[in-house]
Design a protein with these regions (language model features):
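The feature encodes the CheY-like receiver
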Residues: 88, 106, 118
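Active-site beta3 strand of CheY-like receiver
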Residues: 76-82, 87
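Non-catalytic signal-transmission and effector/linker regions of two-component phosphorelay proteins
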Residues: 1-35, 141-152
Length: 152
């Protein structure tokens, strides 16, 4: 039986995206691209996102549970965070609340990428500070467009 991967790789790159809102980037000079922290316990999804981000000149780093999410974010100082809600231990809502307690993380845009659907989850994510909300699976075009709009 074939398993549907959360990211779809058979689409063209999103080269014709809307212009990105540019902001000062604390990682660009050091690493050559925006640093993006992916917080998800799905290893296959992380592998797919890693491949896609690197192909688009982003520098991914990863945390696989809520416990390591905050320490990784503080150590890596990402320009953007991609966050799953259904994490082992505490959920993604807890993670977003934790980020809001740190001035250095409060303005980092968060994209929620989750298997949870429905308006209630989308609203909760928005209220917690998420800038975008996508249900899994999401196409590369939609994800990369959102990333470009938020960090360039």
């Amino acid at each position: 039986m074939l398993q549907m991967l959360p990211l779809i790789f058979d689409e063209p790159d999103a080269d014709l995206c809307l212009p990105a809102r540019l902001k000062p980037n604390r990682n660009l000079a050091r690493t050559g691209g925006n640093k993006i922290l992916v917080i998800d316990d799905d290893q296959i999804l992380c592998l797919g996102i890693d491949t896609r981000l690197k192909a688009n000149d982003y520098n991914p780093c990863f945390a696989h549970d809520a416990e390591s999410a905050l320490s990784t974010a503080l150590a890596e100082m990402p320009d953007l965070i991609i966050l799953d809600i259904g994490l082992p231990g505490h959920d993604g809502y807890f993670v977003m609340q934790s980020f809001n307690a740190y001035p250095e993380l409060v303005d980092v845009p968060v994209i929620v990428l989750t298997g949870l659907d429905g308006f209630t989850h989308q609203r909760r994510c928005s209220d917690a500070g998420a800038r975008r909300f996508f249900e899994k699976p999401v196409t590369n075009l939609r994800l990369m467009t959102a990333i470009r709009q938020l960090v360039g």
